[in-house]
Amino acid sequence: MRYTNPDALVSTKWLAEHLSSPNIRMVDATSYMPGQGKDGRSQYNEQHIPGAVYFDINDIADETIPLPHMIPPPEKFASKVRKLGLGNGNKIVVYDANGGFLAAARVWWMFRLYGHTDVCLLDGGLPKWLAEERPIEDTKPAQRDRHFTSRMNNTLVRSVEQVIANIETGKEQVIDARSSGRFKGEEPEPRPSAKVGHIPGSMNLPFNSLMNPKEHFTYRSADEIKAAVDKAGIDLTKPITASCGSGVTACVLAFGLYLIGHENAAVYDGSWSEWGNHPDTPVDQGE
């Protein structure tokens, strides 16, 4: 079995050969959890792939909502990415400092959400790039505003109200990207949470089961991803909504599913940061 959408994932070799292509734009999306003692923007300022701009998921967000990095209104997204020099005609290559789950997949999903489909991930991200001793820089590229049009695809995102309603209808499979311990309610959440456990009826597919943790978090083969999906009991012929802690690693699941042909997996944007503190959300624990 091969990837259905192989162009969504580019290799470090491919990017090195296309660094000077005029229509390609690199985006560094590195982001860290509160308390990790690291800052994505600072790391970008120290070293990044030549020509890359920094995309801050906490800045390009709806700051009126008291939840981490919720999606912004379409006009704000368009305004922010224009100022980064990202436009309609660009092929956008997104990476981060840990292979792809420190927000690179989130940014890939966001561009698709707002209608820009010519976007892909760098497999292995910055760690693989550095391991191969490819060029880096610490200077910001010259940026000029580009024309970017947001056309929001609401089929790719879910609200808490929609996920609550789905518990009754069961129309969509809800897939949780968190660890097994967090899913079962046996491990604490990294962010404040009044509840532990999982959304009733959801299935657990930890995001790292789709990746190679010992190989710079590159994505597994199509056969391996399909096997992990099958083992979790997921039916690829039915609609899927991915969830996680705050809407970041859920996008790893959405991306992995996209690679093997399930192209319209939605992401529950608030994820457990919202569900675990909402007064009206039921919770299950255990398997």
Predicted regions and their residues:
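Cytosolic catalytic domains that perform sulfur/thiol-centered chemistry
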Residues: M1-E287
